[in-house]
Amino acid sequence: MSEMTPREIVSELDKHIIGQDNAKRSVAIALRNRWRRMQLNEELRHEVTPKNILMIGPTGVGKTEIARRLAKLANAPFIKVEATKFTEVGYVGKEVDSIIRDLTDAAVKMVRVQAIEKNRYRAEELAEERILDVLIPPAKNNWGQTEQQQEPSAARQAFRKKLREGQLDDKEIEIDLAAAPMGVEIMAPPGMEEMTSQLQSMFQNLGGQKQKARKLKIKDAMKLLIEEEAAKLVNPEELKQDAIDAVEQHGIVFIDEIDKICKRGESSGPDVSREGVQRDLLPLVEGCTVSTKHGMVKTDHILFIASGAFQIAKPSDLIPELQGRLPIRVELQALTTSDFERILTEPNASITVQYKALMATEGVNIEFTDSGIKRIAEAAWQVNESTENIGARRLHTVLERLMEEISYDASDLSGQNITIDADYVSKRLDALVADEDLSRFIL
């Protein structure tokens, strides 16, 4: 897991997300507390439970982006789910237990990649030997068995040197590789995904591991052989246990759109996709044991981060038991014009940088001036105020409209320099922004 300090985590998030310092600090502290807990003795470690977080804020202010970036920083099993995809147990739809199953699958993949990387050097050696065995077959005795030579022959050493220097990369060889498993696609109704995956793995394992001769260039064969040899060096049982430990001790679940499962007013009949889902989430967040195809997983120390816009519902509309299990509340602020200006310029891969790079592929040099950036930000904020406030996503809409003409004619503008200043922006957007009916449908 990540050993970054809260300050370092916030600094990394600052490269991609503008503002929302309180939310960044909360997730940074929560992530660091995962590391701190692992430094305690076993008895005390078991007693320290994660403090789950509820992020509240209008759409388009960075809630989901914080989750995306956190996933890359955490170096721990992480999954992001939409609360609206689930229904109460016993009804058509996904059960909330599938969150932990998917998290465990993600952990197995992550641990497998780490194990393969750890064994990569040994796998490269074994792959090299297999290619050399094809180029220079080892000597055999009278009974057709391969003789174990004490010292590699001079010819083998010469070929090894050429292989490492890349002189043989384009030479074709025929080599035996593991055949792809039997492809079986099973369609199942919603909620039966676990049974489907078990049936698929059963069919794929039928017939054992078969070898298939393939003709490949040496550089391509080397890549496939390294993967094959690395996979052989990994112990599947150890891998599963390591993955389950990683989920139980370091797992993070991000539940988006949790406000959409709040109960709205008085309704008759079962509320299977709202309050029913909240009730099913309770044992997961509180701590229970979930059965997965890799083994039993305890959820006592998994960190849950929930987020929602809460424009119609309020956090108090969640059932009280779930509110109590999300003790840390973070409110994200609506974005201002100055925030929009910073979003257009400060992130490592800001929207303006992306558009400049896209147009550069056609030989068109785009330059955004400070006045142009300011006018784009003002236009986006103005449309948000007069219609629906969709936060930073409005910048994509405004910029796409602004760049439409250049994008269409880019192939004819090769070699030209185009400056986008306040006048350029006003000329193309002012009429749309001023007309509320037009901006409602176009911007």
Curated annotation (Swiss-Prot):
InterPro entries: AAA+_ATPase, ATP-dep_Clp_protease_ClpX, ATPase_AAA_core, Clp_ATPase_C, HslU, P-loop_NTPase. ATP binds at residues 18, 60-65, 256, 321, 393. One of its GO terms (molecular function) is proteasome-activating activity. Keywords: ATP-binding, Chaperone, Cytoplasm, Nucleotide-binding, Stress response. It is found in: Cytoplasm. One of its GO terms (cellular component) is HslUV protease complex. One of its GO terms (biological process) is proteolysis involved in protein catabolic process. Induction: By heat shock. The keyword Protein biosynthesis does not apply. The keyword Glycosyltransferase does not apply. A double ring-shaped homohexamer of HslV is capped on each side by a ring-shaped HslU homohexamer. The assembly of the HslU/HslV complex is dependent on binding of ATP. Belongs to the ClpX chaperone family. HslU subfamily. ATPase subunit of a proteasome-like degradation complex; this subunit has chaperone activity. The binding of ATP and its subsequent hydrolysis by HslU are essential for unfolding of protein substrates subsequently hydrolyzed by HslV. HslU recognizes the N-terminal part of its protein substrates and unfolds these before they are guided to HslV for hydrolysis. This is ATP-dependent protease ATPase subunit HslU. It comes from Shigella boydii serotype 18 (strain CDC 3083-94 / BS512). The gene is hslU.
